[in-house]
């Protein structure tokens, strides 16, 4: 239960130092006082605690984020606004962003996940885009533990409950399991929107005398100081603090979304800027809008719609009540905008104005309760240049894992049941993937695909994180995660356009954790430049620790690609017997960090291979060219579990088996060498396909009998499709005590 905030005098704040509990250091308090020219009062110190948090100021991560490559010929708007925007031709643009809601979901899984969905949707429609798809990336602890099972059930319910109710399809995602996430689950949500590229909106408040209009849910005491809550380590006591978690209302969000899209689409002459009230609530949205326009601003807090009595200025400004937006509207157009919101039965009020100068002023009950420079809460927030230190695990010599396989069919069956590999349909079937009727490829293939209405084109989209790689090679995890997402899009027939990211790491004040963050970013940068697909949006979620124990470093990549012709959409499933099976790319004995290593040892050890970006580019360009020439009937990237796992997955939907003959040791069928694809080609297209002279080797053919017959250099074995599929489909429901 939330404890009502008790205001303190500036003198009491200076001596009792309550700001320490809000995430500010003594040095930061002194610096803020210097910037504003007086001892901060209760409201002002609250605003600083929110705006100077890592969640809002990126004070530890900004030096890393500034190195990202964020522009190319397609990018219309990059990081810094609610979401990034990319030109997709024909007057249209795609808008997308991912956000994390990790800490709230650990405390209150249903509402934490639901409000994470709501927040990222608002980011998209604040740009003027209609949200058309949701994706997620989830990470949980040991699935055998009841607490993990509870988190899985409630987080999935929260995502589905909000997305289904608002009418946006959840079309893709991933779910991973590892003990490092037992106390700190990861909930990363991504939203994609489509818009006319000449209607892009920004979050700015410019023009002296222009009005600030608040619209949406009334402000309450939920989620107060949530930005600071998300910018610190967890303890067991804090894990029980549900007052820091917001409560969402998807039906209110639907009204708010439709009303805002009407404003951005049909009342552009009235609108100066628009922004979601997300982390740090009203203070963040308002002061950021003023900062971007180099303006001053005054707000009357008595005019803020409130659902609870006697709220203090601290509470009003730092509440993170959901489903709220702030608009800057040109003088003389206020009633036009208010009338639109009235049509949707939304609470809306003029709560302030843009003023001359650069001060940020708040009035409450006729009293000036905040008078600080806008820059003191935005541009002048501290930036810390940390020095990283290589973790001991990376500096120490480590032996390569060399698996021994005596019963390949049993190993294959067990691999299909590994929590990270196993079928997740029992989870994603709780999401509506087809609302809006644009979804062409449903969850379960390499990437989701939605059509772009009014055209012959489509968008492919996917998410992925790579925690295990980061344990073994810090820079490689960002690289591998990026490349894996690109392969997913290419296998669907799409050219990657750009990415959004969520960088989920531990405490950045610890040199080893900061090293992991910085090195992962370097890997992402290298891949974005090599493939001309920049970072256009994202967020950082640090302090993912409980009682000093951190999660695995986990960069999450969300990627969107363009399919020029609907007829070239490709899925992973076998299509017909007698199609030829080709393996693209070389296979090596890469078992360190693999699912096979986890199965046989329960550990993740060893060093990872180096990445060959040029070879990866060659493979992806070859596959995309073959797909665009209509030579490929099915395509699947090889990742978790390697060749044999991918082969089985391709057979399940059509109930088709395969015969393959590979010049590899049996164990290498489970190797996780990167940069590989499995392709199927109809016999009549064999000559045309091989005439492309790509890095592809014919290894077998699809067969009608539901058996996988495999010949390696040292063994011949046969596995029943039914046996593999049963293991694949029943593993997760069994753990969750569900019926398959």
From Swiss-Prot:
> Listed GO cellular component terms?
cytoplasm
* Matches recorded under Pfam families: AIRS, AIRS_C, FGAR-AT_linker
Residues involved in substrate binding: 100-103, 122, 246, 320-322, 541
What's the protein here called? Phosphoribosylformylglycinamidine synthase subunit PurL
Main enzyme class: ligase
Positions binding Mg(2+) 2 in this chain are 123, 276
What keywords appear on the UniProt entry? ATP-binding, Cytoplasm, Ligase, Magnesium, Metal-binding, Nucleotide-binding, Purine biosynthesis
Residues given in the record as Mg(2+) 1 binding sites: 99, 539
The record places the active site at: 55, 101
List of residues binding ATP:
58, 97, 501, 538
| Organism of derivation | Lacticaseibacillus casei
**Catalytic activity line of the entry:** N(2)-formyl-N(1)-(5-phospho-beta-D-ribosyl)glycinamide + L-glutamine + ATP + H2O = 2-formamido-N(1)-(5-O-phospho-beta-D-ribosyl)acetamidine + L-glutamate + ADP + phosphate + H(+)
What is the recorded function of this protein according to its Swiss-Prot or TrEMBL entry? Part of the phosphoribosylformylglycinamidine synthase complex involved in the purines biosynthetic pathway. Catalyzes the ATP-dependent conversion of formylglycinamide ribonucleotide (FGAR) and glutamine to yield formylglycinamidine ribonucleotide (FGAM) and glutamate. The FGAM synthase complex is composed of three subunits. PurQ produces an ammonia molecule by converting glutamine to glutamate. PurL transfers the ammonia molecule to FGAR to form FGAM in an ATP-dependent manner.
Instruction: Name the domain of life.
Output: Bacteria
**Chief localisation class:** cytoplasm
- The EC code for this enzyme is 6.3.5.3
Query: Which family is annotated?
Result: Belongs to the FGAMS family.
Give the CDD domains listed for this entry: PurL_repeat1 (cd02203), PurL_repeat2 (cd02204)
What GO molecular function annotations does the UniProt record carry, in alphabetical order? ATP binding; magnesium ion binding; phosphoribosylformylglycinamidine synthase activity
GO BP terms, alphabetized: 'de novo' IMP biosynthetic process
**Where does this protein act, in terms of pathway?**
Purine metabolism; IMP biosynthesis via de novo pathway; 5-amino-1-(5-phospho-D-ribosyl)imidazole from N(2)-formyl-N(1)-(5-phospho-D-ribosyl)glycinamide: step 1/2
The UniProt subunit note reads as follows: Monomer. Part of the FGAM synthase complex composed of 1 PurL, 1 PurQ and 2 PurS subunits.
